[in-house]
Each structure stands twice: as C-alpha cells, then as structure tokens.
Amino acid sequence: MLGLTIFVVGQVGAHAYEGPIHQQLTFIAVRHYNNCINDDDMRLTALQTRYMAKANVEQADGGFWRGLFRWNFYNRDDQTPRSLMWVVETRLHEGFEQLVGNLDRSNSLADRYSNLGRVVNHLQDMTSPAHVVPVFVSRWWRFNVGDRFDEFPIDEDDLDQRLGADCAQVGGIIQDTMDTGYQDLLRLTAETTFSAVKGDIEGLPFTWEVFWKPDVNPGSFGEYGAAGNNFGRETAFKCANVRRPRCVLLNDDPLYLEFARERHLNAVQTTIAALARLQRVEAGS
C-alpha cells in the first residue's frame, strides 16, 4: 500500500510547468537578453542556448525516479528539506543547492549550460502558485493530476510588449540583480508569486487565495480554496457580498489572463537575471 501511494502521488507532484512551457519561457528570455547586450562575448550562442533549454525541458518532463521521490515544492518557512515517510523529498531546496553547486563546479561548456538550464527550471517553477503556496496538486481520485494554472498558455506577444523593445526593462533587470545569487533569485521569485496570490481579484471581494489557500503554518501544505483547481475555467463560488451571493469567473476570463501574464513575465525576468549572472562569470566581469 505504501508503495502504491508513493507511486500515485509522487508522479504528479514533482514539477510545475511542463517542458514546452519551460522551453518557450527560456527562448523568450534569451531573445530579449541577447537583443539588449552590446558585448558579443556576453551574448548566449545558439549552442549555449540549446544546452540550457534541453536540460530545462528534460528536468521538467523526464525522470521517473526523480519525479517519484522529489516533488520540488517551495518551503516558505525556513527553506529546509522536508520528507514524507522519510522517503519522498517534498521540498526543492536541498536539490536546488546541489544544482547550484554543480553549476559553480562545471568545467565544460555542455555541463555549465546544462546545469544552468536545471537551475532555471526551478526558478521558473517559482512562478507557479501551487508550488509556492504550496498546494499539493494531486487529485488522482478525480483523474486530476496537475494544477490548471500550469497549463495556461503563454501570451508571447504580450510578454514582448511588456518587456519592451527599448531594453529599458531588460537592462534594469540585469543591473538590479547584478549582486543577486541564484538562491536569492529563487526566494525573490517565490515571494513575488506568494504576494500575487494574496492580492485582490479585481472587482471581486476575494484574493487569489480563493484558488490556492495557504496554511497558517508557512512550513505546511495549503489547500485549494473555494474556487478549487479551476484556474482558466468557468467557476462559481459563494461571495462575501450579500447583494451578489455568487462570484463567477468565466472560461479564459480577462482576470485569469492578467494574472497569468504577470506570472509568466516574472518567469522570463528571473530567467534573464540567472543567465546574465552566468554570462558575467564567463566574461570575467
């Protein structure tokens, strides 16, 4: 029974975004970064980008045993490792530290940018509310094995517009995070996501906690709120306002779109900061 339980729940808790989402976020970040860097030595080459994106996608999509025993949720408490029945590592922090160490010790170009891709994978996942709150996403008895936010499509045109063509925002990201390490990037990205979850839903007497409800203990798992695991879908739940007994969000509601766009923008921003950090080291600056 224990083995069956671990098999069922472990397979669905390991990662947030799937490979194609990670790849798209990575390519957007590299394109904007390269466009805004004047020094040719600081730009990512096609080969470096390929190593980074490939490792990122493989970490998201592959590895039965990795997915079974590492769930990679964020610990908002003290960021120490947590386990389930001394078998399953439920938090990502120890594994992330190992990846950063591997990156720092990398000798070959292939190892260096592959390890960067694995680090970036975790940074991007910190824009997934269910992985930061965190909320355990498995509902296998309902044939529901993931958080629906993680499947929400990326609006690439909107991201391009928000990042801008004049490089002011990208340059600001690079400058502002010049002394920011990968561990701090992880924490800052997670904190931004958690603050967004606690933010108001425009026009409704609720915060986004109606979807992902944190536990009062920051070291414990939260749960789905009154709206359930229905991000992006039509959903209705009891309102706090007696004149409007039901709050309703529609399929692909503009409120969903704006929330997702902000999270995806933050994923691109933290990716730019991470790859800029490695490129500075490579260039010796």
Region spans (language model):
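Bacterial N-terminal signal peptides
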Residues: 1-9
